[in-house]
Amino acid sequence: MKKILAIAMMLAATAAYAQQEIRLYDGVAPGSEGVQDNERVQRGPDGRITQISGVVTPSVTVFLPEESKATGTAVILCAGGGLMAHSWGSDVINMASWLNERGIAAIGLKYRTRVMGGQRPAMGGTGMRLSATVTEFDKIKNANASPDQSGADDENTLNAVNDALRAMEIVREHAGEWHIDPAKIGYLGFSAGGGVGLGAIVKSDAQHMPAFMATIYGPSLIDMTVPENAPKLFIATRGDHHNVAAGLVSLYFVWKQAGANAEMHLYDDGTGPFGPDDVGNTSGTWRESFYRWLTFNGF
């Protein structure tokens, strides 16, 4: 009986939160040939997914608002997890529900993560490691706050970036069906997921360029080149988040120096990640600030 109830809870949770999952590629994802699929999913007591790791087969999960509420805006959610896992429960499921309540479509991107056990070649490099406080943001060149400062782009990062580009293609292909305005699609990334979205901007052509980019304590993991048609940028982080705050201050300056639109929220209430449940801290208001920023900019 307990087993039946557990299965029923899982099915109910899936029906309520995951409307549709679409694989990004037909067959093996480019760059993952020969890599063993070892995906692992963790669930909470209510059956909802909390974390996903070992992702080799990337996909998007579509969360749509009620049609009567739809604003036409869509947010591609890039979860954090250090490129080793996805914090799917907090960064995708919870965030998607919050966005849907406001008429915004949410697309959870399950990009490829680092596969453990030596199944992928390690990146080369000099072993140089980044260490910067927020006042040392000038240490960071081209807004690249990758922990490895060898100058070589990480294969795992580039695979995830390519998945983000493919996700943008899919959302635009289905825009009419999902009641989405193709000109109102952007990325929202947390931690490493912010780096994935920012990397997609660097690699984007006109077809893939988002209308906006929001990064929550997630600096760039590759050299930033701000395009002429740069999307509007929203940044939120804690000022004492080592390396991260410095990387995001550097990103803000790079964006503004290029003449692009950027807004930054630098909170003085802690040293690491934060969420909407931090009600006693100023950083707990970031979602409301993000939503106001979206509406102010016509999204």
Predicted features and spans:
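N-terminal cap/lid segment of alpha/beta-hydrolase-fold proteins
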Residues: Q19-K69, E101
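Short beta-strand element of the alpha/beta-hydrolase
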Residues: T71-G80
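Active-site glycine-rich loops that stabilize anionic/oxyanionic intermediates
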Residues: A79-M84, G239-H241
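Short amphipathic alpha-helix adjacent to the substrate-entry channel of hydrolases
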Residues: G89-G108, F253
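Alpha/beta-hydrolase active-site loop
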Residues: A122-G176, E288-S289
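Primarily recognizes the serine-hydrolase "nucleophile elbow" in alpha/beta-hydrolase
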Residues: D154-A230
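The feature captures the conserved acid-bearing segment of alpha/beta-hydrolase catalytic domains
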Residues: A206-Y267
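C-terminal catalytic histidine-bearing segment of alpha/beta-hydrolase fold enzymes
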Residues: A258-F299
